[in-house]
Amino acid sequence: MPTSGTTIELIDDQFPKDDSASSGIVDEVDLTEANILATGLNKKAPRIVNGFGSLMGSKEMVSVEFDKKGNEKKSNLDRLLEKDNQEKEEAKTKIHISEQPWTLNNWHQHLNWLNMVLVCGMPMIGWYFALSGKVPLHLNVFLFSVFYYAVGGVSITAGYHRLWSHRSYSAHWPLRLFYAIFGCASVEGSAKWWGHSHRIHHRYTDTLRDPYDARRGLWYSHMGWMLLKPNPKYKARADITDMTDDWTIRFQHRHYILLMLLTAFVIPTLICGYFFNDYMGGLIYAGFIRVFVIQQATFCINSLAHYIGTQPFDDRRTPRDNWITAIVTFGEGYHNFHHEFPTDYRNAIKWYQYDPTKVIIYLTSLVGLAYDLKKFSQNAIEEALIQQEQKKINKKKAKINWGPVLTDLPMWDKQTFLAKSKENKGLVIISGIVHDVSGYISEHPGGETLIKTALGKDATKAFSGGVYRHSNAAQNVLADMRVAVIKESKNSAIRMASKRGEIYETGKFF
């Protein structure tokens, strides 16, 4: 087991207490061991190398496996601890650039320049030629750009995201290879890097270890997390050995830079040049500008889908359902559902919600390319919906005066009630609860005479239908007049309160 000083990440410092575990009767799960399993450090993971392995990321964020140089007998965990200890020693003497203020002398050190070129530089070239009129947009090139946008986009949503990151379905090698190759056309990094950072996002949503932590602001979660160098102090890991076991993932990662250049720029340029005699149009519109649009659409999942929309399933974290984002990302905008049910191959569950990715996954399953499509049960989905609705109702209830709580009221026996009634002529018993109606007699809808006949008496039967079956609103008005509970009738009082939604723990009442 790790020694003191180990930097295995725990998800939350606040853990619920379990009496059975703390008493020693039942063993607790070893959190350190469980986190080692969650990061995959108990498994052998050969390193996959390429020329730009950290494309769209940074070394601090993607150091998933470790170099084989040195002691070959060291486990992944041993290498991790050794590297973490080295970083700790360096941190004692050197403050990371992300923790330093921006100045005219160091501003360039804050930036991830590779990503600046990929995310900002190349789009600027494309927009310059497009907006200046140097390369006009023709209809055929536009239509092809839209088609190719869909090819690259679906390769990300159905491939990178739902197939590899979440294993929401399985696919045979032709489909996996297609997604691996044309996922490169979106210039969003290799599937290995993309899937690793995405699994970290789900494991540490809305924490400092979340690569695109929405709490750090809209701009940071949209693009800042890629354009700025991340603090290695908050580096996190997730198990992706299932991904590295896939030969299509290994092939793509090894050759990512070549595949990216071919699919993102060379292929659209050649197709538009050969079929439409417009090489420059293919490069600018089907290449640079298409990449810019698909990148920005994907970034909206990390940003807008955590800021705009509804939270019908849970509101403890920031993800939201947003139909606007769903339109440009082939159905990925229903983010609240996705974070609650991540292994469901669907992101949208209602017929009118836009999710072409789930349709494509379903269609590929019909022709035998995809299989084992996973869905959460409708019962589990309904449970989440009802729990969230109840949470909203409880918040509204907390803002309303529901009358005195029964446990805060004094306990009277019937003799005490009779004695008090001689002093206060407005007391009446209904369902085991004493109410002071003296200030309500003149407002009683049934008239003063009827209510006066109940003073100093038990009017439960008359109130509950013997004379008039009072409405729910009448019961709520009556609850504001509570002054005591009759000891002999406390069970009736509890039943009345429970009908109004009041909850009292069994065995702790009075």
Swiss-Prot record:
Keywords (A to Z) from UniProt: Electron transport, Endoplasmic reticulum, Fatty acid biosynthesis, Fatty acid metabolism, Heme, Iron, Lipid biosynthesis, Lipid metabolism, Membrane, Metal-binding, Oxidoreductase, Transmembrane, Transmembrane helix, Transport
Superkingdom classification of source: Eukaryota
Subcellular location: Endoplasmic reticulum membrane
One BP term from GO: unsaturated fatty acid biosynthetic process
A GO cellular component entry from the record: endoplasmic reticulum membrane
Enzyme Commission number(s) of this protein: 1.14.19.1
Residues that, per the record, bind Fe cation 2: 201, 306, 335, 339
Motif (Histidine box-2): 198-202
Binding residues annotated for heme, in chain numbering: 444, 470
Short motif Histidine box-3, span: 335-339
Catalysis performed (reactions): octadecanoyl-CoA + 2 Fe(II)-[cytochrome b5] + O2 + 2 H(+) = (9Z)-octadecenoyl-CoA + 2 Fe(III)-[cytochrome b5] + 2 H2O; hexadecanoyl-CoA + 2 Fe(II)-[cytochrome b5] + O2 + 2 H(+) = (9Z)-hexadecenoyl-CoA + 2 Fe(III)-[cytochrome b5] + 2 H2O
UniProt motif Histidine box-1: location: 161-166
Domain remark text: The histidine box domains are involved in binding the catalytic metal ions.
Protein family: Belongs to the fatty acid desaturase type 1 family.
Protein name: Acyl-CoA desaturase 1
Lineage, broadest ranks: Eukaryota, Fungi, Dikarya, Ascomycota, Saccharomycotina
Gene this protein is translated from: OLE1
